[in-house]
């Protein structure tokens, strides 16, 4: 059907959410990104609370994409390209439980594709993959100053190579 868009949503955690958001916002077919805190145990956490390590949240990037342009498999392939899925609670120089890697899905129908993708990537590493895969239970938007941070601050910190 011409003109019909097939929107899908996923949240990806890959260390500091600034770089993950900027990276995915540049991909054709991604129509929206937002950063926030995913799958913790407290209500409406602040950045400071998440950084203190007592909330259980990961820094995540909500991604809405048009599946008629880019599929979930391609989104996940790009995700694996920017993380080290064998390191627990760290990406680049960022260390802490909030910097763990994770794939958080809304649609249960996506789970098989996610697990297949994780299995495929595991064949490229000698160490086990520690990237968690969970259904989204909680997602709270991060404070406004975190949204599109690297667009507002082009020379800001980023652990991801955005020149790819």
Swiss-Prot record:
Report whether Transcription regulation shows up as a keyword of the record.
Answer: no
| GO CC annotation | cytoplasm
Which Gene Ontology BP annotations are present?
cellular response to oxidative stress; protein modification process
Keywords on record = Oxidoreductase
Name the Gene Ontology molecular function terms of this record.
L-methionine-(S)-S-oxide reductase activity; peptide-methionine (S)-S-oxide reductase activity
Catalysed reaction(s) here are: L-methionyl-[protein] + [thioredoxin]-disulfide + H2O = L-methionyl-(S)-S-oxide-[protein] + [thioredoxin]-dithiol; [thioredoxin]-disulfide + L-methionine + H2O = L-methionine (S)-S-oxide + [thioredoxin]-dithiol
At the top of the EC hierarchy, this enzyme's class is oxidoreductase
Q: Which InterPro entries match?
A: Met_Sox_Rdtase_MsrA_dom (IPR002569), Met_Sox_Rdtase_MsrA_sf (IPR036509), MsrA_MetSO_reductase (IPR050162)
Give the enzyme's EC designation: 1.8.4.11
Spell out the catalytic residues.
16
Entry's family note: Belongs to the MsrA Met sulfoxide reductase family.
NCBIfam families according to UniProt: msrA
Could you tell me what this protein does?
A: Has an important function as a repair enzyme for proteins that have been inactivated by oxidation. Catalyzes the reversible oxidation-reduction of methionine sulfoxide in proteins to methionine.
**Name by which UniProt lists this protein:** Peptide methionine sulfoxide reductase MsrA
């Amino acid at each position: 059907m011409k003109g019909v868009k097939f929107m899908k949503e996923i949240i990806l955690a890959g260390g500091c959410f600034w770089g993950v958001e900027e990276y995915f916002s540049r991909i054709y077919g991604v129509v929206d990104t937002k950063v926030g805190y995913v799958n913790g145990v407290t209500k409406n956490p602040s950045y400071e609370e998440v950084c203190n390590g007592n909330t259980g949240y990961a820094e995540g990037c909500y991604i809405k994409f048009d599946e008629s342009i880019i599929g979930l498999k391609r989104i996940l392939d790009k995700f694996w390209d920017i993380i080290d899925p064998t390191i627990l609670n760290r990406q680049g120089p960022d260390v802490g439980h909030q910097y763990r890697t994770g794939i958080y899905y809304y649609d249960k129908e996506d789970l098989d594709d996610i697990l297949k993708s994780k299995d495929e990537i595991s064949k490229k590493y000698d160490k086990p993959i520690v990237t968690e895969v969970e259904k989204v239970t909680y997602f709270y938007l991060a404070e406004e100053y975190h949204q599109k941070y690297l667009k507002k601050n082009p020379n800001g910190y980023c652990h991801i190579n955005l020149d790819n």
